C-alpha cells in the first residue's frame, strides 16, 4: 500500500488487560515523494585568469526542478584528483549564475582540469548531485623557444651561410590553440 503525498498524523493506542488505555500522536508528518533533480552547466571549457581579458572568469548555471523544501545547496570546483578547491554555498535561494575567478580557498590558482559539482539538501532527506562537463584552469603561458642557424647568416649568394634555418619548440601543459611566426 502506498499513501499519496501529503501531511499525516500518526496515532498509536494500546489497551492492557485491565482496561487501561494510552494514546500517542505524532502530527505533521510530511510525505513527499516528488523527485528532486538538479543540473549544472559551465559557461566555457576554459578558464585563464591572466589579465589579458580572455576567459578571466567562468560562469555556472544551476537548475533546480523543485525549490520547495530546499534547505541548502553547494557548488564545488573539483580538480582532476577529486579534491574540492573552491566551494560556494547557501541556504534555500540559489543564484541563477555563479561566477568563479579561478582562485582556490587560499586565493591561489591551482592549474588543471576541473568539474563543477553541484549538490542540494532537502528537508525530506534527498541529496541530489550533478556535475558539469570538465574545463581547464590555465594561467601559465606556453613555453616557446626559437633557434637560428647559422648566426650570423649572410644571404649574399657566396655559398657560405646563405640560408637561415629556423627551429621552433612550443610546449604547454594544455593544447596550443594557434600560433604565428
Mark where each language-model region is.
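Short loop/turn motifs at secondary-structure boundaries
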Residues: 1-181
